[in-house]
């Protein structure tokens, strides 16, 4: 009897972020579970006739075995390794930052890299990770320890971690306001340090900014600007655009994912039995309150902005190939064109490039002297326990600015500020565009260098 064997070519070291195969060659987690019908094949059947002594007198094949197909992933191994290593390294760095708002509790996070022009996921990392071989070894004690780990390493935070987006949500609120006609790209709004909204006093993180437009509001991540614009736009319009961008539902990626939640009147009524107030809209407009999204949703969202409203389905499977070399499956190449005017998209993009490239940008220091233009948005989301815990840090970005190729979303739990997560994106872009001198001889990234799961 021949044993069936499945292996993940060149995937050692990053398996925990993608697959786990159990006995009898059945994928139990990640992409292998999703693609099991492609990978598994069909068992053959051979019948034997034996005499009273157990000696075979005749045999015949009732059904020949059909081997499983080879599955090629979109993951680029070099980029994946950089994502995994940079995520872990920067989480450990953030713990050491000395500041009254940092409790040294950064302990987990995720990063996703997506090709904005086709939806391919080029890297996906979740920290802490785990070695899936612990399940194969059937070590009950080790498995129980893994499941009971308070940092939940078995959870793929890239697709199942739900996080308040913080200020990374502001570009969406800006689009909702622009498309609703509440503001234009040139509208200037007075931004005081303090203002009452719905019987609550709100303060601005940037102090008294005077009259500023959208670009400057995104550049400096002005909370007061978005409090006021969000209330004028109305929560229903904001929710409408959040749904258009794909928040509150699955992205369609092949592996397990959660849907997250959108702050809305319906959500508050359903889960709290309470009415909605203007102050709720103000908080929702800066990515707080009941907003909770996954990194895969966030990277899909920023990708849509980058490619002028084209919405692709994120995917990990590049193709499936049968024994004869015939391609039997490729993901759909079509996309949905979202109904956003180019003028409004350009206004938001100008604000996002200012975040990274202007003197006052909230991520300018992290991308200082970078050789090409990156557009992005920082986000710092409160957990509600800021007296004893650090806030979460987020950063979304895309590059190059003029002709985008990749989008990145990163979240660090208790990462203190969004700007502290930006170096992870910088590391990934250095690798993707071969800016690391040690890798210049390899040339530009080739999407055909895909990881292969083979029989």
Positions of the model-derived regions?
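Amphipathic, well-packed alpha-helical segments that form the structural scaffold of globular domains
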Residues: 36, 40-43, 51-54, 84-92, ...
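N-terminal leader/targeting segments and the immediately adjacent pre-domain N-terminus
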Residues: 40-43, 67-91, 126, 447, ...
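Short, charged, low-complexity patches
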Residues: 28, 76, 80, 298, ...
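Small/polar-residue-rich segments within soluble enzyme cores
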Residues: 1-68
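Short, gly/Ser/Thr-rich active-site loops of penicillin-recognizing serine hydrolases
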Residues: 326-333, 426-455
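Beta-lactam-recognizing serine transpeptidase/beta-lactamase-like catalytic domain environment
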Residues: 49-66, 75, 104, 109-168, ...
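Extracytoplasmic/periplasmic mature domains of Sec-exported, cell-envelope-associated bacterial proteins
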Residues: 28, 33, 95, 106-113
């Amino acid at each position: 009897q021949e044993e069936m064997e499945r292996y993940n070519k060149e995937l050692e070291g990053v398996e925990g972020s993608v697959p786990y195969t159990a006995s009898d060659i059945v994928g139990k987690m990640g992409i292998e579970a999703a693609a099991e019908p492609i990978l598994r094949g069909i068992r053959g059947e051979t019948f034997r006739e034996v005499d009273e002594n157990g000696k075979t007198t005749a045999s015949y094949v009732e059904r020949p075995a059909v081997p499983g197909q080879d599955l090629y992933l979109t993951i680029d191994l070099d980029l994946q390794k950089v994502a995994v290593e940079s995520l872990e390294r920067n989480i450990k760095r953030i713990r050491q930052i000395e500041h009254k708002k940092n409790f040294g509790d950064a302990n987990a996070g995720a990063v996703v890299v997506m090709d904005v022009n086709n939806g391919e996921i080029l890297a996906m990392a979740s920290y802490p990770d785990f070695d899936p071989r612990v399940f194969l070894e059937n070590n009950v004690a080790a498995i129980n320890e893994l499941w009971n780990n308070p940092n939940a390493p078995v959870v793929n935070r890239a697709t199942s971690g739900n996080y308040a987006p913080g200020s990374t949500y502001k570009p969406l609120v800006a689009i909702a306001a622009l498309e609703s006609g509440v503001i234009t790209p040139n509208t200037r709004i007075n931004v005081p340090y303090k203002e009452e909204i719905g019987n609550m006093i709100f303060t601005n993180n940037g102090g008294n900014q005077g009259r500023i437009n959208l670009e400057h509001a995104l550049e400096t991540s002005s909370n007061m600007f978005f409090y006021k614009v969000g209330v004028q736009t109305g929560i229903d319009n904001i929710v409408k655009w959040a749904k258009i961008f794909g928040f509150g539902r699955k992205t369609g990626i092949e592996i397990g994912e959660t849907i997250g939640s959108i702050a809305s009147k319906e959500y508050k009524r359903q889960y709290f039995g309470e009415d909605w107030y203007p102050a709720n809209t103000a908080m929702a407009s800066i990515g707080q309150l009941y907003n909770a999204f996954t990194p895969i949703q966030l990277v899909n969202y920023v990708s849509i902005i980058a490619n002028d409203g084209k919405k692709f389905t994120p995917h990990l499977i590049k193709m499936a190939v049968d024994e004869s070399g015939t391609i039997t499956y490729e993901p759909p190449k079509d996309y949905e064109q979202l109904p956003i005017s180019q003028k409004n998209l350009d206004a938001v993009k100008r604000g996002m490039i200012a975040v990274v490239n202007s003197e006052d940008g909230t991520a300018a220091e992290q991308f200082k002297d970078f050789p090409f233009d990156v557009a992005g948005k920082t986000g710092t989301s409160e957990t509600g326990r800021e007296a004893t815990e650090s806030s979460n840090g987020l950063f979304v970005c895309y590059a190059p600015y003029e002709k985008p190729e990749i989008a990145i979303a990163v979240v660090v739990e208790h990462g203190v500020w969004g700007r502290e997560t930006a170096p992870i994106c910088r590391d990934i872009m250095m690798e993707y565009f071969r800016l690391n001198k040690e890798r210049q001889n390899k040339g530009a990234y080739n999407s055909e260098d895909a990881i292969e799961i083979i029989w």
